[in-house]
Design a protein with these regions (language model features):
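Extended alpha-helical interface modules used as scaffolds for assembling large macromolecular complexes
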Residues: 214-529, 533-538, 545-548, 559-577
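Short, exposed beta-strand "edge-strand" segments with a Pro/Gly-rich flavor and a Y/T-containing core
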Residues: 9-14, 90-94, 194-198, 335-342, ...
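Short, amphipathic alpha-helical interface elements at domain boundaries
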Residues: 1-247
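Primarily hydrophobic membrane-targeting regions of prokaryotic envelope proteins
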Residues: 22-25, 63-68, 79-87, 164-167, ...
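Helix N-cap / beta->alpha transition motif
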Residues: 94-105, 158-159, 199, 275, ...
Length: 577
């Protein structure tokens, strides 16, 4: 048992619950760890493995301060965070296990880094174009995740199949993981059960202008930066980022990924210079997209509708219009001028999501420069007439029922092999299934049957296949039960508790103790005792000098020190009452 743990255990016992929870979370302590008291907690936090996990998480300034403290100097203003991490004692000195771990590492050095050079007009233009491309690619990614959640690998990266599918939209596959990380930081996507899903805030973001979309992304990017890169409310010059976690072997790769996301967002130019619009963000001010907006292409609010069931946007379509149009048509190409194609399936999907023939035609008439061609009007009205031919609802018995005025269609569904999992049974009123209503509906929709869900009143219901979760930060581990358990074992006399632990450790290791006993007359006597047992408030062992077995009341023991650790497991700690 280590005597270095005793001061830390006393400090932990006196710390507020919130401070303990923050410490445990920062040190990566599991909420279900099997500690019985604060001495266990202190010893675990001072274990070499725990210290080795904590040191790579220190930013440069704290690493330098810890090294100064190990060298006997004052840690300065950074002593507070290091004490809160249990890497320094309250007096600002390191425990020997921490000193040993720090001494074994390379000395970190801090130096002043000047701000990056401002971008020239050419570099800024390329950065603005990249930012515009990134915002558009993120919108595509969020829309895809809204329709169908994206599969993730165990490590959190997008699955290769998803990358191939997304790359078909024109996004470079090598940027997809960075784009997904930007979207997660902005709260547009969330990882749930190894799937990437769109959140509730994604829809409102999709309908904002390009500059407003960019503003939300870069401010979220700044808020998610590691604390070692932060400078107040802003960030350190990007040229200083690589040196900010000197003891982390994983940092070079992480830093490269963060810098690439900054480049994708147009915050860093290709030559490492800084565009004008990145300066307020670095200095901690709100984002100002005005200088960026001047370099972005002008958004349009009108399209050309053509007889071949396509639509052409003569420039970047306003995001709100683009999002709604893509709910009705399939986008075939994305560039300065985008093209869209209307199909029976795309119109049916719009009807399923709550549109009507009238709302679709009114919307298209409002944004069209060429009116509505007759073939497109015919496609919308015919699809609307067929939509809802199959009605799915729950009857009074709780079973799912499928009804239609078209008996031939019901017969076809009854023998369709694609619908076998539903186990549809025919009766006089239609088809029934033991599967849930939503399951039946989406299976029929996937099989391209014109189905709709209706409520008890017979009115159509709009059902979201992939309901968006609300955006919330990851839940912090709940350390309250652990802290409560530690406090339950916290006695009023820390010295006595520590002595009990020392004696228990000596008994387990069969060590030889130099025990100081308080005699009835108030004098003290020392005994060399080979500890053999502890119980009932008494310590048992063989007195080496007299070669007899002795039983000593623990309350009479003033102190106990291991003098022959080789006799047992090597315990070297001391204890005093």
């Amino acid at each position: 048992m280590s005597t270095h743990a005793r001061p830390l255990a006393v400090w932990l016992a006196q710390a507020p619950d919130a401070q303990l929870a923050a410490l445990f979370e920062a040190r990566g302590v599991r909420a279900d760890v099997a500690w019985s008291d604060f001495f266990d907690a202190a010893e675990a936090l001072l274990e070499p493995a725990s210290i080795e996990r904590a040191l790579p998480r220190l930013p440069l300034t704290e690493a330098v301060a810890l090294r100064r403290s190990v060298n006997g100097d004052d840690a300065g203003d950074d002593a507070g965070p290091l004490i809160a991490l249990a890497l320094l004692r309250p007096d600002g000195t390191p425990a020997p296990p921490v000193a040993e771990a720090v001494t074994a590492r390379q000395d970190p050095t801090a130096s002043e880094t000047p701000p990056p050079e401002p971008s020239d007009e050419s570099a800024a233009a390329r950065a603005a174009e990249r930012a515009f491309t990134t915002v558009a690619a993120l919108a595509d990614l969020v829309l895809l995740a809204s329709d169908t959640p994206l599969a993730l690998l165990t490590g959190g990266a997008l699955a290769s199949g998803e990358k191939r599918r997304i790359a078909a939209t024109g996004t470079a596959p090598e940027t997809l993981d960075d784009l997904a990380a930007i979207a997660v930081d902005a709260g547009l996507l969330a990882a749930l059960d190894r799937r990437l899903v769109a959140t509730e805030s994604a829809d409102s973001w999709l309908r904002e202008s390009a500059s407003a979309r960019w503003t939300g992304l870069v401010q979220a990017f700044r808020a998610a930066l590691p604390r070692g890169l932060r400078d107040g409310d802003g960030w350190l010059p990007t040229t200083a980022w690589a040196a900010q976690y000197p003891w982390s072997t994983a940092w070079p790769e992480q830093c490269s990924a963060i810098a690439e996301r900054a480049r994708l967002l147009g915050l860093i130019a290709d030559d490492g210079s800084e565009p004008e619009w990145a300066v307020p963000l670095r200095e901690g001010a709100p984002a100002d997209p005005a200088s960026l907006q001047r370099m972005l292409p002008t958004e349009v609010d009108r399209i050309f509708l053509q007889n071949d069931l396509t639509a052409i946007a003569p420039g970047p379509l306003q995001p709100a219009l683009d999002v709604r149009l893509r709910r009705i048509a399939v986008r075939e190409s994305a560039a300065q001028a985008s093209s869209y194609r209307f199909t029976a399936d795309s119109v049916a999907q719009a009807l399923t999501s709550g549109e009507t023939a009238a709302s679709i035609l009114d919307f298209l008439a409002e944004i069209s420069l060429t009116g509505i061609p007759q073939p497109l009007e015919y496609l919308v009205t015919q699809t609307d007439q067929r939509h809802g031919l199959v009605r799915v609802f729950t009857d009074a018995s709780g079973r799912t029922r499928v009804a239609s005025v078209d008996a031939t269609l019901l017969d076809a569904m009854g023998v369709d092999q694609a619908l076998r999992p539903l186990a549809l049974a025919r009766d006089a009123d239609g088809l029934t299934s033991r599967a849930g209503r939503d399951t039946v509906y989406w299976t029929l929709t996937d099989a391209r049957y014109p189905a709709m869900i209706v409520g008890d009143d017979g009115r159509p219901l709009v059902v979201d296949r992939n309901p968006a979760p609300g955006h919330a930060p990851p839940a912090a581990p709940d350390y309250l039960p652990l802290i409560a358990r530690l406090r339950e074992r916290q006695g009023p006399d820390a010295d006595a508790a520590w002595l009990d632990r020392e004696l228990e450790a000596a008994v387990r290791s069969k060590a030889v103790l130099l025990v100081e006993i308080e005699m009835p007359d108030g004098t003290a006597r020392e005994l060399q005792l080979e500890a053999s047992g502890l119980g009932g408030g008494r310590l048992r062992g063989r007195d080496r000098a007299a070669d007899v077995e002795r039983t000593l009341p623990v309350r009479s023991i003033r102190s106990a020190r291991v003098i022959d650790p080789s006799a047992g497991s090597g315990a070297t700690a001391t204890g005093e009452r």
